[in-house]
């Protein structure tokens, strides 16, 4: 059977198996040898790594100082702003509360498009009577400063028939009672209530 050589400890293990390797690798001598090995490499190689990093920074700095490179030509600053917006900053959506010019309200991401040469996205369509669209899918406030209707009332948010609310149930589903009526005593047809056995069998 082949033997396994540990580079850190400079020893051959009795044989090459997972159990022998695992036992050797968890031993304190092996762990101490691994730490010593990497500390020795760290001291020897640290200066060479530092020298290579500083030389790469020095070479990069000299490359940027070259006046013949395109990025160092006069008049080459930032790319031109995308068309449609002066200065490249898209305006906030019309009617957005708390949006100072050139900025968006906190928690609102900027609109997609309008950058990297893409045309700007059109603004959201206004709500009823020219009002801005409420944020986060909230319902429109009632006109004239009236209070919201109580929950469950017609026209209340989430009430059946209200826009954005739950749709009314579909009529005429097989096995369902007419709207407004419950199931007859005993439950729906073909359904036995809990505790009742199959028809014709009695509980003992």
UniProtKB/Swiss-Prot annotation:
Annotated Pro residues bias: 77-154, 166-192
Pfam families linked: zf-U1
Cellular location(s): Nucleus
GO biological process: mRNA 5'-splice site recognition; spliceosomal snRNP assembly
GO terms for cellular component: commitment complex; U1 snRNP; U2-type prespliceosome
Main location: nucleus
Start and end residues, zinc fingers (Matrin-type): 4-36
Annotated segments matching region Disordered: 65-204
GO molecular function terms attached to this record: mRNA binding; pre-mRNA 5'-splice site binding; U1 snRNA binding; zinc ion binding
Family matches, as InterPro entries: Matrin/U1-C_Znf_C2H2, Matrin/U1-like-C_Znf_C2H2, U1-CZ_Znf_C2H2, U1_snRNP-C, Znf_C2H2_sf
Keywords: Metal-binding, Nucleus, Ribonucleoprotein, RNA-binding, Zinc, Zinc-finger
Entry's family note: Belongs to the U1 small nuclear ribonucleoprotein C family.
Function: Component of the spliceosomal U1 snRNP, which is essential for recognition of the pre-mRNA 5' splice-site and the subsequent assembly of the spliceosome. U1-C is directly involved in initial 5' splice-site recognition for both constitutive and regulated alternative splicing. The interaction with the 5' splice-site seems to precede base-pairing between the pre-mRNA and the U1 snRNA. Stimulates commitment or early (E) complex formation by stabilizing the base pairing of the 5' end of the U1 snRNA and the 5' splice-site region.
Name of the protein in question: U1 small nuclear ribonucleoprotein C
């Amino acid at each position: 059977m082949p033997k396994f050589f540990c580079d850190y400890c400079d020893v051959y293990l009795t044989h090459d198996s997972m159990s022998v390797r695992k036992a050797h690798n968890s031993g304190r001598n092996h762990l101490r040898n691994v730490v010593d090995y990497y500390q020795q490499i760290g001291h020897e190689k640290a200066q060479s790594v530092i020298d290579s990093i500083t030389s790469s920074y020095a070479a990069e700095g000299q490359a940027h100082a070259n006046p013949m490179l395109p990025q160092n030509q006069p008049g080459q600053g930032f790319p031109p702003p995308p068309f449609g917006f002066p200065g490249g900053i898209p305006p906030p959506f019309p009617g957005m509360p708390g949006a100072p010019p050139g900025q968006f309200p906190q928690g609102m991401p900027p609109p997609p498009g309008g950058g990297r040469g893409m045309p700007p996205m059109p603004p959201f369509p206004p709500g009823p009577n020219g009002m801005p669209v409420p944020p986060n899918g909230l319902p429109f406030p009632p006109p004239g400063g009236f209070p919201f209707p109580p929950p469950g009332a017609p026209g209340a948010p989430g009430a059946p028939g209200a826009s954005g609310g739950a749709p009314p149930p579909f009529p005429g589903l097989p096995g369902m009672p007419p709207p407004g009526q419950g199931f007859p005593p005993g439950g729906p047809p073909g359904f036995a209530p809990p505790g009742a056995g199959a028809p014709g069998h009695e509980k003992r």
